[in-house]
């Protein structure tokens, strides 16, 4: 049975953040720290990660600034004056907390979508805090699809068909009042600026060499432009000495943990985690 422990912790600048600890065993075999995506919240991941929890991993998951229980309904989409860099710093503070509460256990950072891109920025300054990195629904820097993410799918049923082929999961996202939020202009600008150096040779020079990295995506994900956007990311990480495994699922869209083949996706993720912790 999964235990849920809600808590709050302070970011580096003192801002309180809402978070959860999920676990099925005490002590756990390893720690998984989750960074959720844009326009959603950490609570969406408890069910998809249930097999990982059952295998003995504990999960620490926080709602970013401008999201979920951290912001409340009145401030959704606004990172605040610290912008996107503050969100990355918050992740490092949560890593330190998870390590302090679980001394000696491996710590794996998993980020999805915006959370994966935050993780890519985190990597440049804080790779020493983690033992492995998992990126879901991510991409390297590059242009967005001019028609928006739904534009590659003919006759979409909803504005969010690009998330998953599973209509029930798309409908759950649409019905969730904490999902589908729009960013403030300042928050979006800070996010774009954050990504400007993530693949430079100089920026990657200080990253822990040999760090295991697992990237799993759908090959119909418009965020990575059907895998095109991943090529520079994978090349840069391998060039920096990281041990990268790429798993691309045929037909998969953006949220592979909520896709029609999610059982296979989670099984593959768990196998990789068990091999690297």
Where do the PLM segments sit?
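Catalytic active-site module of serine/aspartate enzymes centered on a nucleophile-bearing elbow/loop
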Residues: 240-277
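Alpha/beta-hydrolase-fold enzymes
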Residues: 110-183
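Short beta-strand element of the alpha/beta-hydrolase
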Residues: 28-37
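N-terminal cap/lid segment of alpha/beta-hydrolase-fold proteins
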Residues: 1-24
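Conserved alpha/beta-hydrolase
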Residues: 42-44, 49-75
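Short beta-strand/loop motif that positions the catalytic acidic residue
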Residues: 215-217
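Active-site glycine-rich loops that stabilize anionic/oxyanionic intermediates
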Residues: 36-40, 113, 219-220
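Alpha/beta-hydrolase active-site loop
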Residues: 80-100
């Amino acid at each position: 049975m999964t235990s849920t422990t809600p808590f709050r912790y302070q970011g580096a600048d003192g801002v309180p953040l809402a978070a959860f600890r999920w676990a099925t065993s005490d002590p756990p075999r390893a720690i998984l720290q989750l960074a959720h995506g844009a326009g959603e919240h950490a609570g969406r991941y408890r069910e998809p990660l249930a097999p990982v929890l059952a295998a003995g991993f504990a999960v620490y998951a926080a709602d970013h600034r401008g999201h979920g229980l951290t912001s409340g309904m009145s401030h959704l989409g606004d990172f605040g004056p610290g912008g996107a860099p503050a969100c990355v710093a918050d992740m490092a503070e949560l890593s330190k907390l998870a390590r302090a509460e679980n001394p000696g256990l491996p710590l794996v950072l998993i980020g999805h979508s915006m959370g994966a891109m935050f993780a890519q920025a985190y990597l440049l300054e804080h790779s020493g805090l983690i033992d492995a990195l998992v990126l879901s629904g991510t991409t390297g820097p590059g242009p967005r699809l001019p028609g928006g993410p739904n534009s590659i799918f003919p006759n979409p049923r909803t504005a969010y068909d690009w998330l998953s082929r599973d209509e029930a999961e798309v409908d759950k996202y649409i019905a969730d009042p904490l999902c589908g939020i729009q960013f403030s202009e300042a928050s979006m600008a800070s996010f774009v600026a954050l990504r400007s150096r993530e693949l430079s040779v100089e920026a990657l020079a200080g990253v822990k060499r040999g760090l295991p990295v697992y990237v799993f995506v759908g090959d119909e994900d418009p965020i990575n432009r059907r895998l095109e956007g991943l090529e520079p990311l994978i090349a840069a990480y391998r060039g920096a000495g990281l041990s990268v495994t790429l798993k691309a699922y045929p037909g998969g869209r953006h949220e592979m943990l909520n896709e029609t083949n999610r059982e296979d996706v989670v099984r593959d993720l768990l196998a990789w985690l068990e091999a690297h912790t």
